[in-house]
From Swiss-Prot:
Name recorded for this polypeptide: Oleosin Cor a 13
Subcellular localization, as worded in the UniProt entry: Lipid droplet; Membrane
Main location: other
Gene Ontology annotations of biological process type: lipid storage; post-embryonic development; reproductive structure development; sexual reproduction
Family: Belongs to the oleosin family.
Keyword Membrane: yes
Protein species of origin: Corylus avellana (European hazel)
Source taxon at top rank: Eukaryota
Keywords: Allergen, Lipid droplet, Membrane, Transmembrane, Transmembrane helix
Length: 140
């Protein structure tokens, strides 16, 4: 099957009947969508008119209930998140201790070596300072 190249026509060069069909289709689609949107708007206004007095009457009960339910849900979500975090951390520690080299182990080892070298350096400085202080007090 040979494909025929489609000619792209400028809308100004399209036949008048094609433009009329496009306009009629657009008007029909727009009109048919306008009716349900109007009905939905009217239904929303009626529902709000009926529900607003009920919300005002029951708000002393509803507001604390909503706050309580929200706090309970947030508590469950937070405890679940903390549980997942704890399992993740314990899994990482287990892999690190067993030598499976989890992500970030190199950084941890580098930081530990750097901290140990700084501790040794501070220990040496303290010993030097102590010796200088002892020799300085003996010479006086």
């Amino acid at each position: 099957m040979a494909e025929h190249p489609r000619q792209l026509q400028d809308p100004a060069h399209q036949p008048r009947s094609h433009q009329v069909v496009k306009a009629a289709t657009a008007a029909t689609a727009g009109g048919s969508l306008l009716v349900p949107s109007g009905l939905i708007l009217a239904g929303t206004v009626i529902a709000l008119t009926l529900a607003t007095p009920l919300f005002v009457i029951f708000s002393p009960v509803l507001v604390p209930a909503v706050i309580t339910v929200s706090l309970i849900i947030m508590g469950f979500l937070a405890s679940g998140g903390f549980g997942v975090a704890a399992v993740t951390v314990l899994s990482w520690i287990y892999r690190y201790v067993t030598g499976r080299h989890p992500p970030g182990a190199d950084q941890l080892d580098h930081a530990r070596m750097k901290l140990a070298s700084k501790a040794r350096e501070m220990k040496d400085r303290a010993e030097q300072f102590g010796q200088q202080h002892v020799t300085g007090s003996q010479g006086s």
